[in-house]
Amino acid sequence: MYDSLDFDALEAAGIANPRERAGLLTYLDELGFTVEEMVQAERRGRLFGLAGDVLLWSGPPIYTLATAADELGLSADDVARAWSLLGLTVAGPDVPTLSQADVDALATWVALKALVGEDGAFGLLRVLGTAMARLAEAESTMIRAGSPNIQMTHTHDELATARAYRAAAEFVPRIGALIDTVHRHHLASARTYFEGVIGDTSASVTCGIGFADLSSFTALTQALTPAQLQDLLTEFDAAVTDVVHADGGRLVKFIGDAVMWVSSSPERLVRAAVDLVDHPGARAAELQVRAGLAYGTVLALNGDYFGNPVNLAARLVAAAAPGQILAAAQLRDMLPDWPALAHGPLTLKGFDAPVMAFELHDNPRARDADTPSPAASD
């Protein structure tokens, strides 16, 4: 079975106990890895990980910062900054670190910079790096939990871990294709959304801002096991995503147990808040959601939103009682027929003067107006 392996040569090259690890070494040999590649992996303490690691790499490191800069027509400092904004590091300015694929990817950024300007292009790198880092962490957590054999601490068997890791890593290019497809759909959705909220060529938009969170979340984290907390947050995130999208909104971000979203109209903003607070899943789990809402002109930058309406909505959700929706006065004025009770004035952090708010309730008439009648459906 191991006739093709020269154990003495492998041991002399630096691979410890090759005969005891014959199964792993044969597996790597059958995958086409050279002795040199195995030795390098052994030096990194990752011989068991070589089969999967190679599928994660973008290619052999052939460019230093200086040679990559020459290839791209940039300074080495610009290349280093771009790589840093992506959340990535290089071993040193003169150490080959970047692959051909890395440099080709940066060439796309260089071309984009010429189209949209330096600030926009650098901002995109920051967003991309943050998003990819979060995605990578989510994937890693998913794989560790769903395929425990990927961990040596679980199997205590290098060959079993190598096979499991390889099977998981083979999804990397397929997930890349999935990302490309989903990205295209989200670009089309974002274009449609922004067409409804932009007023000029600036980055400012006029829209509704919503925040919602789980009441007494700190107490929940102390009462639940990690597994129960994971299930709770997973279900909450899924419910929020479904509700916001169903009501025509766009998710901006999750912050622990809180979510921020934007809506193109006051009606859609409030409908999403009502559906979140009254969500049957939350009631079944005996959870209480609260929300804070505002409407106005904000700065849309790098996938996030900034401005007074954002600050106001964030402060209102913090002031809301469990199961309560607090809306800014301007939003209330835009929905005169929506059931509301005056609440305030409130003293909110960051606001010099007390702020008038309104507690909003469900509006069955608005819901009925959104639902086609049987006759209209025929």
Curated annotation (Swiss-Prot):
CDD domains: CHD (cd07302)
Gene Ontology BP terms: cAMP biosynthetic process; intracellular signal transduction
Any one GO MF annotation of this record: adenylate cyclase activity
InterPro entries, A to Z: A/G_cyclase, Adenylyl/Guanylyl_Cyclase_3/4, Nucleotide_cyclase
Guanylate cyclase domain ranges (all copies): 208-317
One Pfam match: Guanylate_cyc
Annotated family: Belongs to the adenylyl cyclase class-4/guanylyl cyclase family.
Protein name: Uncharacterized protein Rv2212
Provenance organism: Mycobacterium tuberculosis (strain ATCC 25618 / H37Rv)
